[in-house]
């Protein structure tokens, strides 16, 4: 079992849903970047004054609506800003002694994600088709939500993708991940992915909510 990072023992997190907090529209109106993360950054001194030691962010990656329907794991949602805005927020938080944790929505993707789109067009036997789940000849969805396409966690390509995503953002300065809907993902997937992340980032916090709270 991996040793828990020492900084976690005294972590008090301030949780915020960025898209709602900064007043972003429910759906992207265009791909034009709106630099809204600065509206969150101005609250960091207040977070410290409360006695918190961590900034816990809801979804920040490019999505089709509420943030849990990811379009691109490698870009910040343009309704929030761009990579430079996020890097600035990370630095501002770290300068104040705040750790930054982000939401990892790795059970499913938006129906508009290129993997889902390619799978739909090329079929279940295609490279993309093998990265998602199918039911009765159709793309399988998460708990009946038609816009959330379930990833196939038995596919090594999916494990490689999620490992790459997590390490990419940890390389940029993210200190930890909340694993959304982790209870839906087979344990063998996490047993392959999480050690690969901890090997490169041993102080990274990895956690999930109880299934009853999801």
What are these model-derived regions, one by one?
Residues 101, 176-182:
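Short catalytic-loop micro-motif centered on adjacent basic/acidic residues
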Residues 56-59, 180:
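Residue-level recognition of beta-strand->loop/alpha-helix junctions
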Residues 3-13, 17-53, 60-172, 190-201:
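Substrate-binding/active-site clefts of carbohydrate-active enzymes
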Residues 183-191:
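An alpha-helix initiation/capping motif
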Residues 207-214:
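Conserved small/polar residues in nucleotide/adenosyl-binding loops
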């Amino acid at each position: 079992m991996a040793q828990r990072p020492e900084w976690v023992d005294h972590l008090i997190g301030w949780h915020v849903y960025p898209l709602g907090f900064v007043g972003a529209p429910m759906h992207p109106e265009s791909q034009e970047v709106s630099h809204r993360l600065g509206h969150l950054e101005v609250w960091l001194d207040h977070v410290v004054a409360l006695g918190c030691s961590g900034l816990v962010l809801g979804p920040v990656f490019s999505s089709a609506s509420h943030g849990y329907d990811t379009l691109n794991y490698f870009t910040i949602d343009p309704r929030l800003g761009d990579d430079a805005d996020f890097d600035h927020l990370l630095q501002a938080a770290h300068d104040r002694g705040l750790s930054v944790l982000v939401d990892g929505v790795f059970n499913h993707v938006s129906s508009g994600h290129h993997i889902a789109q390619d799978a739909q067009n090329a079929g279940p036997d295609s490279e993309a088709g093998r990265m998602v789940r199918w039911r009765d000849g159709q793309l399988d969805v998460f708990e009946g939500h038609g816009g959330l396409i379930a990833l196939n966690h038995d596919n090594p390509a999916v494990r490689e993708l999620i490992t790459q995503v997590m390490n990419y953002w940890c390389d940029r300065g993210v200190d930890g991940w909340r694993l959304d809907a982790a209870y839906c993902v087979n344990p063998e997937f996490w047993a392959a992915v999480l050690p690969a992340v901890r090997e490169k980032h041993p102080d990274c916090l990895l956690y999930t909510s109880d299934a009853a709270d999801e």
